[in-house]
A protein has these predicted regions:
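Serine-hydrolase catalytic core recognition
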Residues: 203-357
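Beta-propeller folds
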Residues: 1-222, 226-234, 238-243, 258, ...
Length: 357
């Protein structure tokens, strides 16, 4: 009965404490951007009406939106504002002594704060501290030092022609990197207490698409994974770093006999010579003589990676009837990092279609 009631709108909120939230919603005329997202962040206490909420921050009407965030990690409680300039660019402000201070990183970089660390993932090449940090890398620095002017980042990941960073997730004591190596998932564990030493996460299914779906970063090193592949139904796994081996918790039922099919990866040359990978799924031992119906799928946009995933419909309605399924990882997606995405933007958009053809 004493909950927070917000009318239907494009809204955003973050808990500050049991009785207080940061709220972005339609507070009336002028409170939404031209994109119809929240233009203001306000502090609302339990029992207050929307008109009583205290203004914390506002952005230009031409910006996409704005969000307020409170981090609850014991000993590292902090408040942040994220100004979303558009789909790919944002600015992060940290409240220091009650005043918002913009973190001096590129607008197209992803930013996260974890305890004493500032983590930065630039999406374009960034020269900082006299060192060129490539697009798609992952950098770490002590937040206090950064605010004081230090720019001596530690490089946690550097992309190459075959490897891209898909995501990163903290547990209580470590950092798990989800990498794509030639469009197959590989997970690596970094330990900040030993200079970010790294080791592979053992037990991750091979040639699958694997994502971290949850961790407990303030309490334990427990982690949960979701794994899938062309012939592997969705599977949930659980482990605890250093104490409990990764094991399957539950899997979806299969919808076709996967033992009949082979999954292969091949590479094709696009018109400009760029090698473009694609997966092929077909009956084992199939003679590829051009006589078999083939379903070709691809996307190539918004830096979205098209990765191996299970489809009962494709398996039962197409593969079991003799069809061949092909998934193409064309440019415009994120399979090889930001550069793979930007290579098919604007005047270069035809490259995505050339890759697909």
């Amino acid at each position: 009965a004493d909950g927070f009631i917000v009318p239907t709108a494009k809204s955003d909120y973050s808990w500050i404490d049991h009785d207080t939230i940061y709220l972005g919603t339609d507070f009336g005329p002028g409170s939404m951007t031209e994109s119809s997202y929240p233009r203001t962040v306000r502090r609302l206490r339990r029992g207050e009406s929307l008109s009583q909420a205290t203004l914390v921050h506002e952005v230009s009407p031409s910006d996409l939106s704005v969000s307020g965030i409170h981090q609850h990690t014991p000993g590292f409680e902090r408040d942040l504002i994220v100004e979303h300039l558009d789909f790919y660019r944002s600015r992060t402000l940290l409240f220091v002594d009650g005043q918002p201070v913009r973190l001096a990183v590129p607008d197209d970089a992803d930013v996260s704060l974890r305890r004493e660390w500032l983590i930065v993932h630039p999406r374009s090449d960034w020269t900082v501290g006299g060192v060129m940090r490539p697009a798609g890398s992952l950098l770490a620095i002590k937040l206090d030092g950064f605010l004081a002017g230090d720019r001596g980042f530690e490089e946690l990941f550097r992309p190459d022609a075959h490897t891209a960073l898909e995501d990163w997730d903290f547990t209580d004591s470590c950092l798990i990197l989800t990498l794509l190596v030639d469009v197959a998932s590989t997970l690596v564990v970094l330990d900040p207490s030993t200079g970010w030493s790294r080791s592979p996460l053992v037990g991750v299914p091979a040639l699958s698409t694997v994502h971290v779906i949850d961790t407990d970063p303030d309490e334990s090193d427990e982690f949960w994974l979701h794994a899938t592949g062309f012939t592997t139904p969705s599977t949930v796994l659980r482990g605890v770093l250093g104490s409990v081996d990764l094991r399957v918790i539950r899997s979806s039922p299969p919808f076709f006999d996967a033992s009949r099919f082979d999954v292969q990866q091949h590479w094709a040359a696009s018109d400009d010579g760029t090698r473009v990978p694609y997966f092929q799924v077909a009956v084992r031992g199939l003679v590829l003589d051009g006589s078999h119906p083939t379903l070709l799928s691809g996307y190539g946009g918004f830096q979205a990676s098209r990765l191996p995933e299970y489809s009962g419909i494709v398996g039962r309605a197409w593969l079991e009837r003799g069809g061949v399924f092909v998934l193409a990882n064309i440019r415009g997606g994120g399979e090889f990092g930001p550069g793979w995405h930007t290579a098919a933007l604007k005047q270069n958009r035809p490259r995505a279609y050339e890759d697909f053809a």
